[in-house]
Amino acid sequence: TTKAYRAHEQEQVILRRAYTLDAVLRGMSIYIDPEALLVGNQASADRAAPIFPEYAMDWVINELDQFDQRDGDRFTITEENKQVLRDIYPYWKGRTLQDKGYAAFPQRARLFYDLGIIKTEGNITSGDAHIAVDYGRVLREGLKGYRARTLEAQEKLDLTDFQDLKKSYFYQAILIVLDAVEAYALRFAELAQAQAASATPERAKELLEIARICRKVPMEPAETFHEALQSVWFLHVILQIESNGHSLSYGRLDQYCFPYYERSRQAGMTEEQACELLENL
């Protein structure tokens, strides 16, 4: 994240965030658990969590040596990773969302904050939250549908108009992110394909199916229940990677996934197989 922000300091904020997500999705550690049927990870291991320095860093540095001693939400962090965080801290000082939010406080609000009358940490240090995106539309159209609509909208812009110029940054960011999402999914397709070569016959069959699905969704419309759940999970985990995973919901998973469940059941999927996929989710 820090490398990407440094590399794109001259860009508009929305483009810096798009390039950062692109760098993360292409470069982060990925893995497939031994019996997993759905793939996609937010951190480098199960029960781990990434740090989002662009939102806030003061509290991270202040609590760095107490993470493993807290009453709740304990984390163990290596000395090496502690040093990495201390090394990037000077860059983020004054640049985080929290810093910019505090700078925008009216004088009276700042006084109330300093006195402890108001608290802002849950909102001022987080991305978009308490939302459920339109997973159903992605399942129906695939992200290639979003790409096509974005390119069409770009063609209609008049870049001599200031409002259209602002829109152009948004559309550029969409295209960067869509390419990044596709690259992320394809990384899992390649990993599953590679693992299949040394797996048991039964597991190899599962891994090859994972590879096939990851080459398809979320860019293409889903057709099966397995494809639908994998597409939803890719979108859900990437949203958490992009905006620190604060209060994101699946919404009505039962409604938008039911057509794919019904189709797969008619094609021979058993109730036990469907249940196993949901347990993976």
Annotate the PLM regions.
Residues 1-156:
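Long, non-catalytic protein-protein interaction scaffolds
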Residues 145-281:
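Structured, charged N-terminal subsegments at the starts of enzyme catalytic cores
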